[in-house]
């Protein structure tokens, strides 16, 4: 079980397994079709032209040290004598390798994952056409009855109905203490179960009234909310006493971080209330390699945050400092040493190095134009509103994106 993605498949060393599903970009597709390997030991030197307005054929940065796709994404090779089973099959590459595939998608591990349970290489969370074709962790289907599904969010595995309605519990309610009655039922609909339904895992059935059975999670009856007007909405969690349901929950940020209300929802902020921003980036090579980790080329980030000048970048976007003894208690949040002039990892004691907070191994920032708690003036800075190469606020709750 991982902190951010729930249950995942791993190799024998505990490294998370990923696939690279084909993804529609602005000028074509990238990623891998089912049954076809596209990630090879070839160093790509030019852009593919998949993201307008950039043309194909432009030289990529740092070619003298540029890795190949398989340097960063290691194929999970088939050992002699192994046989396909279930959704696990074998695909053959143009280089003759035999590689495991899950649901026909070739499987890899990430060079960024250092310990069992790490998912630094990618996420199951959905993303739009502005971002690069991402690698996704794979795992077993969540253990939920057929009436439910689970979506990975910033808070954890959000439990929803099969038609993507959020479900809720009322604090203090249990099978023997049904509190939502009378006028409460005008807004909250009990999630009733058919006659042949059976409990499974953390899900059970409680008798709401003679002959009427209601789904429950950890013994607490489940409801939907009438004002959730679309898929994935979470408006009901704003009502006192009501909470969303998560199959697993992500770890809390370090204790010095705070939550702040904005005109568009709620964001994570530092101890002074300044909004926290995350940087994301994917290059325009056919391999769609990442460029947002301290081990990646920094020219993309420097272009966005400071017109190529690291000093201007630091004036505009401030690293969030961490104390020398700072600890978070999780792998998702870590205090790391960074050289602010290069953006790369450094060591304690190196002149100019800073100890800063990082999320998923990537430093987080505040923005110089945010003057008071709740300001989000740096949100969507960069290419395609920050989705391709840029910075976005760390949204705890975004009212314009259904609360996620």
PLM feature spans:
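Compact beta-sheet-dominated domain cores in extracellular/mature segments
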Residues: 1-404
């Amino acid at each position: 079980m991982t902190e951010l993605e729930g249950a995942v498949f791993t190799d024998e060393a505990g490294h998370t397994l990923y696939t690279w599903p084909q993804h529609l970009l602005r000028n074509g597709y990238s990623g891998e079709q089912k049954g076809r390997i596209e990630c090879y030991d070839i160093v790509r030197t030019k852009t593919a032209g998949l993201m307008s307005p950039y043309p194909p054929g432009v030289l990529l940065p740092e070619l003298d040290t540029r890795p190949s796709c398989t340097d960063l994404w290691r194929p999970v090779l088939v050992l002699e004598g192994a046989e396909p089973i279930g959704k696990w099959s074998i695909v053959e590459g143009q280089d003759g390798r035999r590689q495991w595939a899950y649901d026909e998608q070739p499987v890899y591990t990430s060079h960024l994952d250092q310990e069992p349970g790490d998912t630094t290489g990618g996420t199951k969370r959905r993303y739009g056409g502005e971002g690069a074709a991402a690698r996704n962790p794979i795992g077993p289907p969540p253990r939920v009855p057929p009436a439910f599904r689970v979506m990975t969010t910033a808070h954890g595995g959000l439990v929803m109905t099969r038609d993507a309605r959020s479900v809720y519990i009322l604090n203090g309610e249990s099978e023997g203490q049904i509190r939502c009655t009378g006028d409460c039922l005008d807004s909250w609909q009990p999630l009733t179960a058919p006659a042949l339904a059976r409990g499974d895992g953390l899900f059970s059935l409680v008798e709401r009234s003679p002959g009427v059975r209601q789904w429950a999670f950890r013994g607490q009856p489940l409801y939907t909310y009438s004002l959730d007007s679309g898929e994935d909405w979470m408006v009901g969690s704003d009502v006192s006493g009501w909470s969303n349901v998560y199959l697993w929950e992500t770890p809390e940020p370090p204790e010095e971080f705070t939550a702040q209300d904005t005109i568009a929802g709620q964001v994570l902020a530092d101890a002074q209330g300044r909004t926290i921003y995350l940087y994301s980036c994917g290059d325009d090579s056919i391999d769609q390699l990442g460029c947002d980790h301290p081990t990646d080329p920094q020219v993309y980030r420097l272009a966005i945050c400071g017109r190529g000048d690291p000093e201007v970048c630091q004036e505009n976007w401030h690293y969030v400092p961490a104390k020398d003894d700072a600890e978070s208690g999780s792998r998702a949040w870590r205090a790391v040493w960074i050289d602010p002039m290069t953006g790369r990892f450094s060591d304690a004691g190196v002149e100019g190095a800073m100890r800063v907070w990082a999320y998923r191994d990537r430093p987080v920032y505040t923005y110089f134009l945010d003057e008071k708690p709740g300001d989000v003036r740096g949100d969507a800075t960069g290419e395609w509103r920050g989705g391709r190469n840029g910075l976005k606020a760390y949204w705890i709750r975004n009212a314009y994106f259904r609360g996620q």
